[in-house]
């Protein structure tokens, strides 16, 4: 297989192997006097019609603002914004976002103001810089971390590129954790593993996700990490011989079928090996699938032809085939996944995809923008560069996928869940869960957490549908509401039209999605508050009559406003609710 170059969507002709294996943000300028050159080169390849002069201006400003600063590594501080902008350029971001990467620390760490940034570079760059700056202002304690993550979600719901810049910032900082105190590095690594890496995964940014996981794993579990490194190294020779045999046989089969492809093998990441050991309960000696094979072809038809060739040579492992081309993940990911019984009876995991799919798999939302208007707010989530719009128009494969819906759902959670720690817990739970894909009766795909139930489905469709759920059909059959849904199920919800319809507390024992759980709790909280207000009003009225006090005179709206103010309550209903809940005694109102 003599593959040398390949046209990649939105990119100039580049060497296929270099594209498939290149690490983000690691190209260093050959000219130390012009460190911006590789960034501009990559940015130009992605956005040939864009004016790149903003990059020169942003770099000059960053140099001025950071001239007296140094990193903890001892390097000039400008190294960091250059690295962040290089990562953003490699992701395919436009010059506006790359410029924001160059400037992202100026407002936070220097005397440069946001107003100055806005005047010099415009509202979009200033907005991105402001969004990233606000995410760095809370650093101490669990509650502060939870509030920071809440701010992150709000910022990315306004413009998802804020998160892309923050992820690039986190990647480069993670590469330099060895220069900071161990306790600080471990705190950042835990936050990264729990939140930032899963967020990158949800946005389809596998290259970012994988590196963040590896760097965090190394800091959090250094002993285990080093043990796995040594164990993998011991098998390296045997692994390479085995991998060479597999690649040769696949190439031979594809050549016979006249399928033009780029076939590559790679060792599994250390963190993924560790996860296999934990999930499967095996020690390293019993983990055989230490390598993965990837086949990249030109067309979807070639994907299935290559799959046929692979399965003709090796038997597939039952239950290990996934067709994410026919049913893409909601983060835009598309590929065929299969595990086969390879030479020597050892399992081999194989991914098959097109070049367009490969770019989306590595760079996710950064590679394929899908913009939508926020109907409630009447504003765009973000404004694409011209070449972003062109790329989106030319690629219709995933035109029906609304990949910003999940982000907007998170933004809704922030307003629905006042407690930041509770919100962070729900977010971690949602990010950490695997997914199941089911259908509405009209054929729309709904993504739910693994082991989700019809009640989770109902709340995913609409909150009111969830509240009014009284039954469910799965694949045409009536089922209990706690039934576990499987991939491909068609779910129909039966709802009540009664004015008194509402959820059951029992549902909290089996729902899996944070949204369903939060909505059910909110409903009962609201119901309980209404009951408490009525109970408090009745209790106060009875107490006043028992003491022969003039109810009609003392319980006027004007009088109650004064009472609430004297007792530091926001309004009269809050006073009644406190009495009804037993938080305050009616005697307080007589003094």
Residue ranges and their predicted role:
Residues 296-298:
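Short hydrophobic/aromatic beta-strand micro-patches
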Residues 2-161:
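Metal-dependent phosphohydrolase cores
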Residues 16, 32-36, 114, 122-125, ...:
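Internal insertion modules embedded within essential enzymes
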